[in-house]
């Protein structure tokens, strides 16, 4: 069988088409280049050049950097119909060499391939983190004339914490790795032991958008372009822009469930590692799901700021000072114990607080701020239909909020039982969200709050300008109509 050495020390059979996954985004303006995004699958058609491969994605073919992709470990899923079919691979984690031969049906060999890939990618990832911390961050700290502490915090987030965590994680992986028989390695327990540590990725992922915006502003100055490029060359890093390196942790945390799912696929149920890998897969799926959910919440904070700006007579702190998610909203009757009057209000339940609003009597789409309830101080009490002696009212579809410190009580009446059930479910969801946020230290940064406020101000100005233009246009139109009536032929002035 003929072997051709490809990029990154990989060996590929000369008559084979293999599949590779993009590790980095590749943007190209070249006529014969092929562009792709991280996660895309590329068919490698020619790997005879060490640095540049020829490949196909969808219907497009072209050249791309070999260092931007990784070959699939187990390529046996390809259909065996000829010499150009996808071949099976084996990756030696010590030499980083992927050898592609004939398909093997041996489950142990397949498991060894996945184990070896996990070990190899972890070692490469550690190097990327080291390059970021020592090649970029360390050099930036030396240039106080170019970077403030706040800027570096925004750009790099908690990358050093991630680096320290990953070094400890990889050390434990190495202890679990069986060099002689990789398929016997038991790495599932390692993920379970470190599961709480992976939550530090949440802070990094939540900050990543701010990092990109800050870098984008700096890169408008050629000094920063030259500085970051000099850092890359000095550290002997691959030809990727700094924003590409900073994206790596975001990509990495999302890859763990995929790798563990593949490992579980090739782990026999009687293998000593099976139940641990299955548990690790569930844990890492939950971690990535929660991180993605929190990232989505941060992307929606502009909407919360815009909503608050639309509420008239607002008092007190901004919603974003404590909350980041609207959980439920609805209209209910409400009685507050000291007054005992039944009032109709619109309630907006956020994490940590519930805002009370009153609709305008004429313009029902206009809301007036009427107060808020600190959900951290209250407990929810489900009430059966009947008479309440404390409030001296008949109750149906009711529940109470009881202040555990002051003994204050709020009584609520939903219009229907189904609505009451939805509210009770929403309160449980609110408490669960708060507990999970506290566990991983989730919060909105001051920079993100400022950004949301700026977005609202910008939108208000644009709306104001549009309104003025519409009014001016309407006045001009009316003036023209008047003039036309005054000076039309056959009519006296």
Curated annotation (Swiss-Prot):
Keywords: Cytoplasm, Guanine-nucleotide releasing factor, SH3 domain, Synapse. Pfam families: RhoGEF (PF00621), SH3_2 (PF07653), SOS1_NGEF_PH (PF22697). SMART domains: PH, RhoGEF, SH3. Residues 107-117 are annotated as: Interaction with GPHN. Residues 110-294 form the DH domain. Residues 15-74 form the SH3 domain. This is Rho guanine nucleotide exchange factor 9.
């Amino acid at each position: 069988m003929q072997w051709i050495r490809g990029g990154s020390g990989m060996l590929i059979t000369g008559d084979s088409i293999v599949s590779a996954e993009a590790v980095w985004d590749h943007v190209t303006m070249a006529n014969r280049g092929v562009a792709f995004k991280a996660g895309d699958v590329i068919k490698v058609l020619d790997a005879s050049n060490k640095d540049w491969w020829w490949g196909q994605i969808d219907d497009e073919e072209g050249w791309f950097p070999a260092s931007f992709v990784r070959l699939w470990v187990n390529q046996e899923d390809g259909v065996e119909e000829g010499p150009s079919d996808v071949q099976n691979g084996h990756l030696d984690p010590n030499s980083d060499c992927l050898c592609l031969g004939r398909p093997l049906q041996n489950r142990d060999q397949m498991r060894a391939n996945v184990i070896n890939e996990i070990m190899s990618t972890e070692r490469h990832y550690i190097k990327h983190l080291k390059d970021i911390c020592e090649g970029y961050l360390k050099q930036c700290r030396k240039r106080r004339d170019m970077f403030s502490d706040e800027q570096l915090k925004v750009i790099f987030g908690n990358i050093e914490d991630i680096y320290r965590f990953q070094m400890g994680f990889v050390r434990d992986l190495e202890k679990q790795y069986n060099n002689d028989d990789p398929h016997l390695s038991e790495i599932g327990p390692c993920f379970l032991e470190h599961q709480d540590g992976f939550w530090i990725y949440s802070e990094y992922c939540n900050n990543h958008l701010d990092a990109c915006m800050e870098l984008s502003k700096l890169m408008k100055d050629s000094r920063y372009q030259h500085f970051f490029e000099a850092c890359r060359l000095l550290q002997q890093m691959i030809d990727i822009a700094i924003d590409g390196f900073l994206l790596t942790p975001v990509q990495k945390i999302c890859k763990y469930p995929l790798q563990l799912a593949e490992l579980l696929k090739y782990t026999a149920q009687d293998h000593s590692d099976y139940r641990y890998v299955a548990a690790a897969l569930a844990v890492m799926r939950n971690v990535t799901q929660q991180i993605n959910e929190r990232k989505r919440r941060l992307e929606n904070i502009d909407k919360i700021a815009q909503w608050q700006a639309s509420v008239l007579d607002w008092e007190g702190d901004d919603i974003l000072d404590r909350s980041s998610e609207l959980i439920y909203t609805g209209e209910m009757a409400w009685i507050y114990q000291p007054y005992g009057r039944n009032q109709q209000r619109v309630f907006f339940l956020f994490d940590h607080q519930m805002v009370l609003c009153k609709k305008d009597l004429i313009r029902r789409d206009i809301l007036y701020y009427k107060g808020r309830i600190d959900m951290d101080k209250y407990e929810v009490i489900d009430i059966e239909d009947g008479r309440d002696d404390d409030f001296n009212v008949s109750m149906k579809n009711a529940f109470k909020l009881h202040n555990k410190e002051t003994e204050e009580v709020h009584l609520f009446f939903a219009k229907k039982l189904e609505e009451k059930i939805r509210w009770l479910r929403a309160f449980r969801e609110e408490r669960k969200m708060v507990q999970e946020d506290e566990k991983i230290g989730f919060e909105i940064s001051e920079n993100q709050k400022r950004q949301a406020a700026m977005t609202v101000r910008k939108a208000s100005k644009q709306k104001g300008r549009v309104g003025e233009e519409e009014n001016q246009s309407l006045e001009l139109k009316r003036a023209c109509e008047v003039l036309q009536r005054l000076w039309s032929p056959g009519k006296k002035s």
